[in-house]
């Protein structure tokens, strides 16, 4: 399965989960290494844009294409989540789900519903899982955001 990530070119190929360990994420707490990837290039763009300050145009960003094995993916069903799971301030239960996944190390990746686009998915990859050795970077290229996408 090919997944995508957009981020600062200086860190884009770091698959150790160091950024998530430092800052946490919607589905993981600070202190837990994890790698967030998206199911499409377009979703990767949206995941960056929703966090930008108005009028900020990111530069020095890259798009990373990553291949992960499909035989070690656990899926989170929307029906199992609290009603407010899409809220900007995500409920604590989401971090509990992700933290448990990362701690158990039973699967390489956790498929997560996107809070931005219905029927699209993000993935939380556990860099400490043994199958991480099978994860491959396929392509890295500079990425420029179209100025029309930036909040005015």
For each of these PLM feature ranges, what is it?
Residues 2-17, 28-30, 57-152:
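Active-site and NAD+-binding cores of ADP-ribose-processing enzymes
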Residues 27-47, 51, 124-128:
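Extended catalytic/binding region for NAD+/ADP-ribose chemistry, centered on the ART fold
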């Amino acid at each position: 399965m090919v997944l995508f990530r957009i981020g600062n070119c200086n860190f884009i190929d770091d698959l150790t989960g160091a950024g998530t360990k430092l800052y946490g994420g919607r589905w993981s707490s600070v202190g837990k290494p994890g790698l967030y990837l998206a199911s499409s290039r377009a979703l990767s763009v949206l995941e960056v844009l929703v966090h930008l300050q108005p009028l900020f145009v990111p530069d020095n960003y890259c798009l990373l294409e990553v291949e992960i094995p499909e035989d070690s993916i656990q899926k989170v069903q929307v029906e199992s989540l609290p009603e407010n799971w899409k809220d900007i301030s995500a409920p604590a239960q989401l971090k509990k789900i992700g933290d448990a996944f990362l701690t158990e190390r039973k699967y390489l990746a956790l498929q997560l519903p996107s809070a931005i686009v219905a029927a699209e998915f993000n993935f939380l990859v556990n860099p400490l899982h043994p199958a991480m050795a099978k994860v491959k970077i396929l392509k890295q290229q500079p990425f420029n955001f179209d100025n029309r996408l930036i909040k005015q």
